[in-house]
C-alpha cells in the first residue's frame, strides 16, 4: 500500500509511527493506521463500472511488476488439497455431493494449473465491497490483507468470479457483458497474452474453488456467537459448474 501510494495509485496510505514504522504493537497485537479513503462500495457493479475496475487493476499490475519485494500466496493452488483434507469428512453436511465435487475439480485443476505466466503482487480479494466509488467515479481499492505474489491472470479470474455473476445461488448466471467490459478496461493498460487467455479457464475454476474451500472451512469451524458473518459456500457451486463447462477464453466474452 505504501508503494502503490508512492506511485499514484488510490488506496489507503499507511501512516508511519514515531519510530518510522508502519506496524505497531498494542496488547500483543499488531495494528496499522491508514489514511481515510473517500467513497463507498457498491453491491453490484454495472458493466461500465467493471470497465473502470479492469482499467485500475491493470494500472495496479503495471506498478507492482517493478516491486522488488515478494509475499507468498498462502492460499495458492498448493494449499487447497490441505484445506480440503480438513473439511472432507464434514462438508457433506453442507451439500451431499460436495466432497466428490471438490475432489473432481481439485484433481483437474492441479493437473492443468499453469507454471509460468506473468506475475507480481496482486490484490487477490477484489470483491465489490473492496472497491470504492465516489460520485460514480472510482475512488480506490481497500483491504489488501490477502495481497501476494501470483499470476496477474489469476487476479482477473478472481474478478470474473467476484464481479461477473448475477442472480441468487440457485440460478447464478455469468454476465458476459460485465466480463467483456472488465477485459476492455484491463487491455487498455496491459494486454493479456495468448498464454494467459489459454489459462483463464483453469484459473477461474481455481479461483472459484479457492473461495469455496475457505467458505466451507469457515462454515464448519464457526464458533457460537461469532461476530463475523459466515458466507454461504454453495454460492460457488454454480460458478464451478460454469467454469468446468467453459471451453476457452472466448466463452467468457460472448
Question: Where are the language model's segments positioned?
Answer:
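Active-site acidic catalytic loop and adjacent metal/ATP-binding pocket
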Residues: 14-15, 107-154
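A glycine-centered beta->alpha junction motif in the catalytic cores
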Residues: 31-44, 85-89, 209-225
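An alpha-helical support segment within catalytic cores of ATP-dependent transferases
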Residues: 69, 81-124, 134
Amino acid at each position: 500500500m505504501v508503494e502503490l501510494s508512492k506511485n499514484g495509485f488510490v488506496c489507503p496510505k499507511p501512516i508511519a509511527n514515531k519510530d518510522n514504522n508502519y506496524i505497531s504493537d498494542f496488547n500483543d497485537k499488531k495494528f496499522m493506521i491508514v489514511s481515510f479513503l473517500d467513497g463507498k462500495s457498491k453491491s453490484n457493479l454495472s458493466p461500465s463500472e467493471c470497465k473502470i475496475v479492469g482499467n485500475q487493476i491493470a494500472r495496479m499490475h503495471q506498478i507492482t511488476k517493478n516491486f522488488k519485494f515478494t509475499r507468498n500466496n498462502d492460499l495458492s493452488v498448493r494449499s487447497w488439497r490441505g484445506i480440503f483434507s480438513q473439511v472432507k469428512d464434514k462438508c457433506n453436511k453442507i451439500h451431499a455431493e460436495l466432497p466428490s465435487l471438490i475432489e473432481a475439480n481439485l484433481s483437474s485443476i492441479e493437473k492443468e494449473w499453469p507454471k509460468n505466466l506473468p506475475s507480481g503482487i496482486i490484490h487477490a480479494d477484489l470483491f465489490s465491497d473492496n472497491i470504492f466509488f465516489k460520485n460514480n467515479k472510482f475512488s480506490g481499492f481497500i483491504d489488501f490483507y490477502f495481497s501476494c505474489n501470483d499470476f496477474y491472470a489469476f487476479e482477473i479470474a478472481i474478478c470474473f468470479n467476484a464481479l461477473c455473476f448475477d442472480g441468487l445461488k440457485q440460478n447464478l448466471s455469468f454476465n458476459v457483458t460485465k466480463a467483456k467490459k472488465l477485459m476492455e478496461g484491463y487491455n487498455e493498460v496491459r494486454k493479456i497474452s495468448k498464454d494467459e487467455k489459454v489459462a483463464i479457464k483453469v484459473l477461474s475454476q481455481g479461483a472459484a474453488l479457492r473461495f469455496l474451500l475457505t467458505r466451507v472451512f469457515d462454515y464448519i469451524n464457526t464458533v457460537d456467537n461469532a461476530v463475523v458473518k459466515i458466507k454461504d459456500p454453495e454460492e460457488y457451486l454454480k460458478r464451478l459448474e460454469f467454469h468446468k463447462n467453459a471451453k476457452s477464453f472466448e466463452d467468457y466474452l460472448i
